[in-house]
């Protein structure tokens, strides 16, 4: 005796799963596009604001943060890296810019200035940074130039890299490895000393 089983319900289920995956993919692509456009628009707006403040603003005597939280811009010409720096390291900030790490000095102050950004967006070019590369940091106080003295990989809880220094030092922090999928297990550290 032969039993016939209809494949119609299985086919409908598989088609439904297929459409579900397509909808999820479209949603993820849409979200990614929104995040990229939002970051681009934020950076354009803040770059214009920085240029306007630099043009119309008398140089303050103390380190300054604009009312919007804008601190300045980092440029590493050899790497083609240019990113706005704002105060804080919340998820929203790091989605749109590099963030000044609270508790570290501001540019222009003595000590270890800490700046962080995501490895898969703004700090992706750091994978190619080399000793003696020049980092330019433009702020409301003026322009600072730093020379890279070292890079290293540390654990995510190693805050010693941000400890104070008697000199003017810049520390860039991003997740590592650069091509890791998911939450990266380590941090990539770039240490630079001020030269002008």
Language model feature labels by segment:
Residues 1-11:
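Terminal targeting segments of Actinobacterial cell-envelope proteins
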Residues 9-196:
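Solvent-exposed, non-transmembrane regions of membrane-associated and secreted proteins
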């Amino acid at each position: 005796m032969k039993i016939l089983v209809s494949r119609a319900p299985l086919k409908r289920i598989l088609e439904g799963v297929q459409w579900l995956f397509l909808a999820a993919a479209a949603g993820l692509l849409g979200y990614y596009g929104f995040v990229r456009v939002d970051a681009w628009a934020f950076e354009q707006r803040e770059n214009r604001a920085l240029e306007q403040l630099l043009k119309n603003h008398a140089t303050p005597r103390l380190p300054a943060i604009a009312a919007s939280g804008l601190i300045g811009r980092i440029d590493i010409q050899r790497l083609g890296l240019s990113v706005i720096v704002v105060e804080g390291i919340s998820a929203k900030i790091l989605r749109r810019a590099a963030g000044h790490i609270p508790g570290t000095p501001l540019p222009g102050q003595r000590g270890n200035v800490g700046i962080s950004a995501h490895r898969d967006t703004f700090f992706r070019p750091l994978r190619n940074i080399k000793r003696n590369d020049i980092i330019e940091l433009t702020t409301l106080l003026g322009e600072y130039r730093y020379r890279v003295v070292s890079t290293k990989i540390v654990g995510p809880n190693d805050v010693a890299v941000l400890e104070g220094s008697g000199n003017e030092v810049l520390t860039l922090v991003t997740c590592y490895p650069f091509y890791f999928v998911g939450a990266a297990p380590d941090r990539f550290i770039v240490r630079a000393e001020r030269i002008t």
